[in-house]
Amino acid sequence: MKEQQKETEQNIEEINDETVTEQIETDVDTLEKEAEVDPQQVEIEQLQSDVKELEDKLLRAQAEIQNIQQRHARELQTVRKYDGQKLAGAVLPAVDNLERALQVESEDAVTQQIKTGVEMTLGTLVQALRDNGISATGEVGETFDPTKHQAIQSVASDDVASDQIATVLQKGYMIQDRVLRPAMVAVAK
């Protein structure tokens, strides 16, 4: 019986060894097959990855170009809106001088003819300024606005309400919504 038992144990061992060996061989074959990667497949996967990366870069570049175009359009619009600002600043003293010349009283005919010519010149300049979006600011009775007006003095006045312009010492000018020169005014108390 012992011999039979030994023989049975040997048979079991041999069967186990064969089963384990077969299992190991199967596992090794499977691993070898998995390890054998098709080089074309690897290249395809790499190319697909590269394509995705390039598509992402393209989208980012297109977005950046669009942002640059929008920024340029806004800047161009601002430049166009305020393009006469420098010229207007240079012309305003001439307008002031022409207005002062018209305030001079005169009786003779020659002076009246000169005054008429000055009025026409002033009218042409004011119209040209208006056509370019430049307007005067600071009228008597207008509410004082520190962004548009510069208060030179405060005066008592029965003609206008408190915090309104009582006297305009020098007109102010605006181009669109930007102050070129604040009006110098006296404000009622």
Swiss-Prot record:
Residue span of region Disordered: 1-22
Q: Localized where?
A: Cytoplasm
Q: Where is the composition biased (Acidic residues)?
A: 10-22
Q: Which UniProt keywords apply?
A: Chaperone, Cytoplasm, Stress response
Q: Which PANTHER family match?
A: GRPE PROTEIN, GRPE PROTEIN HOMOLOG, MITOCHONDRIAL
The family assignment reads: Belongs to the GrpE family.
- Which HAMAP family does UniProt cross-reference here? GrpE
Report the protein's function: Participates actively in the response to hyperosmotic and heat shock by preventing the aggregation of stress-denatured proteins, in association with DnaK and GrpE. It is the nucleotide exchange factor for DnaK and may function as a thermosensor. Unfolded proteins bind initially to DnaJ; upon interaction with the DnaJ-bound protein, DnaK hydrolyzes its bound ATP, resulting in the formation of a stable complex. GrpE releases ADP from DnaK; ATP binding to DnaK triggers the release of the substrate protein, thus completing the reaction cycle.
Q: NCBIfam families from the entry?
A: PRK14140.1 (NF010738), PRK14150.1 (NF010748), PRK14162.1 (NF010759)
Q: What is this protein called?
A: Protein GrpE
**Species of provenance:** Leuconostoc citreum (strain KM20)
Per UniProt, what is the name of the gene that codes for the protein in this document?
grpE
